[in-house]
Regions:
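Conserved ABC ATPase signature
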Residues: 132-136
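ABC-type ATPase nucleotide-binding domains, specifically the catalytic core motifs of the NBD
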Residues: 12, 30, 93-113, 121-123, ...
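Conserved catalytic motifs of ABC-family nucleotide-binding domains
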Residues: 153
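ABC ATPase C-loop
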Residues: 149-150
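Helix-to-loop junction immediately C-terminal to a conserved catalytic motif
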Residues: 48
């Protein structure tokens, strides 16, 4: 499991995360709700090895995730799908996907197997495999970004704001794809502002405010919480 204990992150004198505690059990989808600036992306950067913490620990299956290099965390089974997708728009869909397998570049046969698996998970991409990634719709580009992360063969997928900028119908399709990824055996930590969509597929969740965990609970508990309903569900 993922276990984060008293994790704090500073940017100079500014503290972005304050003693964050959270867990993701094997096979779970856990949502991290929070507004812009709440600290969600900072947490993900820290878990993926892009940012060093000021204090605290984070482990996946007992192996430390902090203090190393990002490629080490990918090799340990933790992959980040970043906010904004960050595709190479002039490269084909398939070339973008193959870049996600860089950490396994010596295993050509395994890369081909994984490519087939992600096409099974995202069948809409099969007919677009030779098209420039930048020519796809926003929803299709998000699916390419998720699929590229899966090419690293993660056991834990960190998804940062996958619904950003997408129309409601497309959000529904993307979250259905995330559910399929989870059903294939991948644990998911999902950072989102779209609480309705995220809690629709999550097992549990946390609310991050000002870099602190202010609330946590099951899907049902968070959907029924007046603070969540007011701040994130608009009811």
């Amino acid at each position: 499991m993922l276990e984060v204990q008293r994790l704090s992150v500073n940017y100079g004198p500014f503290r972005a995360l304050h003693d964050v505690d959270l867990t993701v059990q094997e096979g779970e989808i856990v949502v991290l709700l929070g507004a812009n600036g709440a600290g969600k992306s900072t947490l993900f950067r820290t878990l993926s090895g892009l940012q060093r913490p000021s204090a605290g620990t984070a482990t996946w299956r007992g192996v430390p995730l902090t203090g190393g290099r990002p490629e080490f965390n990918v090799a340990r089974g933790v992959a980040l799908c970043p906010e904004g997708r960050l595709l190479f728009p002039d490269l084909s869909v398939e070339k973008n996907l193959r870049l996600g397998a860089f950490v396994h570049r010596r295993d050509a046969a395994g890369t081909e197997r994984e490519l087939g698996r992600v096409y099974d998970l995202f069948p809409d991409l099969v007919g677009k495999r030779h098209a420039p990634a930048g020519s796809l719709s926003g929803g299709q580009q998000q699916m390419v970004a998720i699929a590229r992360s899966l090419m690293a063969r993660p056991q834990l997928l960190l998804l940062d704001e996958p619904s950003l900028g997408l129309a409601p119908l497309v959000v529904e399709q993307v979250f259905a794809a995330i559910s399929r990824v989870n059903a294939s055996g991948v644990s998911v930590l999902l950072a989102e502002q779209n609480a309705f969509a995220a809690l629709g597929i999550a097992h549990r969740g946390y609310v991050l405010e000002g870099g602190r965990v202010s609330l946590q609970g099951s899907q049902e508990a968070l959907l029924g919480d007046d603070r969540v309903r007011s701040a994130y569900l608009g009811v």
